[in-house]
Amino acid sequence: MALVVKGKVNINEFIDLSKSEKLLPSMFTPVKSVMVSKVDKIMVHENESLSEVNLLKGVKLIEGGYVCLVGLVVSGEWNLPDNCRGGVSVCMVDKRMERADEATLGSYYTAAAKKRFQFKVVPNYGITTKDAEKNIWQVLVNIKNVKMSAGYCPLSLEFVSVCIVYKNNIKLGLREKVTSVNDGGPMELSEEVVDEFMENVPMSVRLAKFRTKSSKRGPKNNNNLGKGRSGGRPKPKSFDEVEKEFDNLIEDEAETSVADSDSY
């Protein structure tokens, strides 16, 4: 089943632009060029994986300039029969940051019975064009108690971002223009019933463990790193209790709209 595309990404959900900023030429406003990326897709085949994701796909960057990742929409669909047990945690990562708690931009937990889900993250920070060309963002996926044979794809994810491209540092800051910004740190969103069992294992802890485990194995391709679905490596004790509880989760199926892939 492919994700169903419905409508466009609403820029106003991320940036509160005034009427003058919408009408005036860019030279007269602090906001220069607001763009929506094309869709980037990841097919998840592993129980645990850290994969690169292109959040600026189709975005025209300015040489020697900057790009501000204002917000992104992540849509997912389980490729499973109805009412399957288990679930997933999804975390957006900035791979430049060495401290795991600073590298996590936002995370989301949901059960497999949900079938389709969507969440938004508001990173709201700028990077140089040179850094952006190195594809610095990743997604950490941790699937629990989904019993599927190795070699198949239980979950599909799609990513669309809203960003601002500019040549020089904007004199008037953008933070006051961005809606729903959480200044307390990385956002962790969840379905309530999943959060009951998962909140004691923050995604920053999972990221730190994954990075340590990967470094011991030696350098590998960053795309789809992680343990295979048939791997038998024992879990850390702190995860065992979560696994037992998580196995009994069943949530009502809910529909959600999916971000459009157009860029402009």
From Swiss-Prot:
This is Movement protein. It comes from Tomato mosaic virus (strain L) (ToMV). Residues 211-264 are annotated as: Disordered. Changing K130E: In strain: ToMV2(2); ability to grow in tomato plants harboring the ToMV resistance protein Tm-2(2). Residues 237-247 have a biased composition (Basic and acidic residues). It comes from the Viruses. GO terms for cellular component: host cell cytoplasm; host cell plasmodesma; host cytoskeleton; viral replication complex. It is found in: Host cytoplasm, Host cytoskeleton; Host cell junction, Host plasmodesma.
